[in-house]
Amino acid sequence: GIKHTETTVCETDDWIAGYAHTYGDNTEVIVASFDSDFFQLITENVSILRYRGDNTVICTPAYLREKFGIEPSQYADFKSLTGDSSDNIKGADKVGPKTASSLLSEFGNLENIILNAEAIKKPSIRESIIRNADRLRTNYKLIKLEGTVPLPFTMKELPYTYDGITTNEVLKGIGVK
C-alpha cells in the first residue's frame, strides 16, 4: 500500500525537500508537481515532473537555465525578487524575470544584490531593491525550502507496487524516462 502520515510541525513541501536533499545525491529523484517552488530542489539527480499530457515537461538544470537564465540554487532568490502571485508574495517593484535573472547573473544571490544595491546601474531598480530589502529577505525565508525536517519514512519503507507494476514502469508508461 501507500504510506501515509500527517503533521502539524511542517508543510509537505518541507518533507519533499528533505527527501530530495537526503537521497538526491545518490539516487534519481523525480518530484511530480506543478508547484514551481520545487525548482530550487533541482540538481543533476533531482528533477521536477510537470505532467500535462502531450505537454509534459521534466524540469532539469538545463530547463531552468533556458527558461529563466538561472541556476536551480538561485530559484528562491529569483522568486523573492519577482514575487509569486500563487503564494501571494509581492516581489520588488520594477523587477521582472529578465531583470531578476540579470541581477542574479551579476551578483550571485539575493543577499549580495541587497548588500551591493548601490552598484545597480539602473536607478529605478536600485531604488526598488533598497526600498524593498526587508520584504525581499522575508520573501526568501518564505520561499526557501530547507529540507531539514525529520523524515517520516526511509526510502526503503516507501516502495510502491500495484498489481506487479512498479512506479518506474508507470512513469515510463506515460513517457517519463
What is the predicted role of each segment?
Residues 1-153:
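Extended two-metal-dependent nuclease catalytic cores across DNA- and RNA-processing enzymes
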Residues 162-164:
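S-adenosyl-L-methionine-dependent methyltransferase catalytic core, i.e., the SAM/SAH-binding region
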Residues 168-177:
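Long, highly charged low-complexity segments enriched in Glu/Asp and Lys/Arg with interspersed Ser/Thr
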